[in-house]
Amino acid sequence: MAEERKLYVCMRCGRTFSKSEMEILPGIRCPYCNFKIIMKVRSPMVKRIPAI
């Protein structure tokens, strides 16, 4: 199974980074500007489910 890379975006500086880059600092913070509020990027693929 291929490892899926999770991407995050900083709400202050707008840079995109991975979880491994985020682990440089203690806690959950942007590795570039040290801001606490980050957002996980959703995958561009739409998940379709059948109607009941």
From Swiss-Prot:
Highest rank taxon of the organism: Archaea
Gene Ontology biological-process annotations: DNA-templated transcription
Location(s) in or outside the cell: Cytoplasm
Keywords: Cytoplasm, DNA-directed RNA polymerase, Metal-binding, Nucleotidyltransferase, Transcription, Transferase, Zinc
Spans traversing the lipid bilayer: none
Keyword Nuclease: no
Main localization (coarse): cytoplasm
Family: Belongs to the archaeal Rpo12/eukaryotic RPC10 RNA polymerase subunit family.
Annotated protein name in UniProt: DNA-directed RNA polymerase subunit Rpo12
Species in which this protein is naturally found: Pyrobaculum calidifontis (strain DSM 21063 / JCM 11548 / VA1)
